[in-house]
Amino acid sequence: MPMYRSRTSTHGRNMAGARGLWRATGMTESDFGKPIIAIVNSFTQFVPGHVHLKDLGQMVAREVESAGGVAKEFNTIAVDDGIAMGHDGMLYSLPSREVIADSVEYMVNAHCADAMVCISNCDKITPGMMMAAMRLNIPVIFVSGGPMEAGKIDIDSLDAKKIDLVDAMVAAASDKLTDEEVQHIEENACPTCGSCSGMFTANSMNCLAEALGLALPGNGSTLATHSDRKQLFLEAGRKIVEITKRHYEQNEKGLLPREIATFEAFENAMSLDIAMGGSTNTVLHLLAIAHEGKVDFTMQDIDRLSRKVPCLCKVAPNIENVHMEDVHRAGGIFSILGELSRAGLLHNDVPTVHSDSMGEAIAHWDIAVADNQAAKDLFKAAPGGVRTTQAFSQSNRFKDLDIDRKGGVIRSKEHAFSQDGGLAVLFGNIALDGCIVKTAGVDASILKFTGKAYVCESQDQAVNDILTGKVQAGDVVVIRYEGPRGGPGMQEMLYPTSYLKSKGLGKDCALLTDGRFSGGTSGLSIGHVSPEAAEGGTIGLVEHGDTIEIDIPNRSIHLAVDEATLAARRAAQDEKGWKPVAKRKRKVSTALKAYALLATSAAKGAVRQLPDDE
């Protein structure tokens, strides 16, 4: 039977000093012997997805204590990708994932905590904490801050519709809108606390936490502002004590992260991601999380799943006027998982933190089949329509649920948006280890695209050349040396894709990069090209005017240059060194250099790899 980790610092004469310090934090004699639960919070006033989390850690802590545990809270950093976007701040976003994972490991191992409740929300925070959870392999429950309510606009020059952050970015670069109209969109795009309202990276990852079995039902879709979300936090506090005692005191199996998030669970999570057209960043993060848990889940597995899982749900930015609040009304993640299960595309026998099996959980929480009033009540939680930064500030209810699986927000396999899923892996001579495209956001007319390369040595150059009209219809904009090492930090390319839209080129151009894309990206945007240019990838050999052939249905991408020419270019590049032609105006700090030194390519999740970690 496993012993509580915390006994290392709470028992024995040699730990008198440690116990003295524990007492100074408020612990008493009766607390020594109880499980110590780390409340891993990520509150910050910099990020709307985290601004409301300040008091929630202590709310969970009180619940832990009532259930018989000892709760100790600490905080991690949290970078807002939207605020860091478009300048050198974005260099820090992906590396912050590793910092978060390390900081959680440092705190939990240094203080010998027995279990964790991870309070995350936005882009790199959830995956960073998940990496730590798989690395530590102690009982854990994830509970996120929840999605933001969608913004709403109604102005003369635009149709009345729901909006989000990406709409504000596109509008700002459009010459068809007045300054006043742009300001109106800006003021209404992000009306409440929470993670941005579409199926962007943050919400995608919080949904995947449900599919991995590490979060409670409703985690990915219950709005940050709704009072129902409070129950998720309270239940997380109670449940973590229960499963911690079952693990340590009863030696019960199937309760640790690596026993829950198995290979089959990763297949479930990826199938969900493909079915809902989630962010391409989730590929990067799932690979990294699997790596930490020593799960052999690869790009080849993702490619295999992408060929058989249909697109069952389209959410902004892949479709207008559908946001996370609409997914919630349609039954949330367990309704999508239910449709996958009925299509024979889900592993139903994997455990979760709240149920013995995924199949059992679906039977209880999928509103299309479950006669469960609690589920029906949960998924009626509606937006409040009032600007606020406060969690649980409203209790509005939808009058009815969306259970239309023919034409609703969530579809059955028979009535899918497409039988081809929302994400695809492409391979070819320009991406020998693969690259990723969110097919749910690609217009059907350009699933096959051949164009001339317009090469940019940085995101900054691409933005300038798009806005100044140098990029023309038919171009494939190639942005290189923006990978994990080359950036360093693998920046998101949301501004270039948004500006292509604003210039009316969204269906006339492709964008190809060894960097990555925001979850807010749509269009023919292909990222994660591996190997990256800085590692000697073929993307570093592309020249202006080269023909690039993209064939999504056949999962291929090809640089139409003969092998002899490529070999000559490679020899020349080897001699010059794999770096941008012109020196970039970019300050690369010691911290970023350290990340770049160890970072792997996107095909391996951009994790750090030591020489003995091969």
Swiss-Prot record:
Would the keyword Nucleotide-binding be found if you checked this record's keyword annotation? Answer: no
Q: Which Pfam families match?
A: ILV_EDD_C (PF24877), ILVD_EDD_N (PF00920)
Q: Which GO molecular-function terms appear in the entry?
A: 2 iron, 2 sulfur cluster binding; dihydroxy-acid dehydratase activity; magnesium ion binding
Q: How is the cofactor bound?
A: Binds 1 [2Fe-2S] cluster per subunit. This cluster acts as a Lewis acid cofactor.
Please give the GO cellular component terms listed in this UniProt entry.
cytosol
Q: What's its top-level EC category?
A: lyase
Q: Under which EC number(s) is this enzyme classified?
A: 4.2.1.9
Q: Give the pathway.
A: Amino-acid biosynthesis; L-isoleucine biosynthesis; L-isoleucine from 2-oxobutanoate: step 3/4; Amino-acid biosynthesis; L-valine biosynthesis; L-valine from pyruvate: step 3/4
Q: Which PROSITE patterns match?
A: ILVD_EDD_1, ILVD_EDD_2
- Please give the residue positions where the record annotates the modification N6-carboxylysine: K124
Tell me if Lyase is a UniProt keyword of this record.
Answer: yes
Binding residues for Mg(2+), per the UniProt record? D81, D123, K124, E492
The reaction(s) annotated as catalysed by this protein in its Swiss-Prot or TrEMBL entry are: (2R)-2,3-dihydroxy-3-methylbutanoate = 3-methyl-2-oxobutanoate + H2O; (2R,3R)-2,3-dihydroxy-3-methylpentanoate = (S)-3-methyl-2-oxopentanoate + H2O
Task: Tell me which UniProt keywords the record has, alphabetically.
Answer: 2Fe-2S, Amino-acid biosynthesis, Branched-chain amino acid biosynthesis, Iron, Iron-sulfur, Lyase, Magnesium, Metal-binding
One GO BP annotation here?
isoleucine biosynthetic process
Relate the assembly described in the record.
Homodimer.
What is the recorded function of this protein according to its Swiss-Prot or TrEMBL entry?
Functions in the biosynthesis of branched-chain amino acids. Catalyzes the dehydration of (2R,3R)-2,3-dihydroxy-3-methylpentanoate (2,3-dihydroxy-3-methylvalerate) into 2-oxo-3-methylpentanoate (2-oxo-3-methylvalerate) and of (2R)-2,3-dihydroxy-3-methylbutanoate (2,3-dihydroxyisovalerate) into 2-oxo-3-methylbutanoate (2-oxoisovalerate), the penultimate precursor to L-isoleucine and L-valine, respectively.
Its family remark reads: Belongs to the IlvD/Edd family.
- What protein is this chain from? Dihydroxy-acid dehydratase
Task: Kindly list the organism's lineage.
Answer: Bacteria, Pseudomonadati, Pseudomonadota, Alphaproteobacteria, Rhodobacterales
The gene it comes from is ilvD
